[in-house]
Regions:
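FNR-like FAD-binding dehydrogenase module
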Residues: 1-169
Length: 169
């Protein structure tokens, strides 16, 4: 998930001596974070360009803010190029922030299908902008797996060209 990438980024920035705070986009308020030296938004896009639930209200707050904060902003979009609205929410966040005059920390970029390599490439660019060596070695946490034993199997519908199987484990 995007939160896993955020945890990797938080850990790497902390190890590089940076002060870091991570929160869901729904909790982000530009006025409350006025003292931040920089802001980094990791934004996933779902379905037809929809925002994740954790981003509720973010665009409204960005659109209502007066000129952008002094802290430069980086937006990294997460999505799947197999969908027509690839990273559309992240692009919208980027566009609204730039329209408000928010300075760019690093150019807008995207990560396709949770690619650790693309994330690491973006991390090197971010590190260069910050003047630090930043190695983002993201290792996704795999879900727990369980071995199942097949007890029985019943097949139906093959003669009607609608095969169905009932499996009992």
């Amino acid at each position: 998930s995007t939160w896993g990438f955020a945890a990797t980024l938080l850990e790497a920035l902390t190890e590089a001596g940076q002060r870091v705070h991570a929160a869901p986009m729904s909790a982000f308020d530009p006025a409350r974070h006025a003292s931040a030296k920089r802001v980094i938004i990791l934004a996933a896009t779902y379905g037809d360009g929809d925002a994740p639930a954790s981003a509720r209200g973010l665009l409204d707050r960005l659109e209502r803010m007066e000129p952008g904060p002094a802290a430069p902003l980086a937006v990294l979009g997460f999505g799947d190029r197999g969908f027509p609205a690839y990273c559309a929410f992240a692009e919208t966040v980027e566009r609204v922030a730039r329209a408000k005059g928010w300075a760019e920390l690093v150019p807008f970029d995207t990560v396709d299908r949770q690619s650790s390599q693309e994330f690491a490439r973006w991390g090197r660019a971010l590190g260069a902008a910050l003047g630090i060596d930043l190695d983002l070695a993201h290792q996704p946490v795999l879900p727990a797996a369980e071995t199942l034993t097949l007890v029985s199997r019943r097949d139906y519908g093959a003669e009607a060209q609608a095969p169905t199987a009932i499996l009992r484990f």
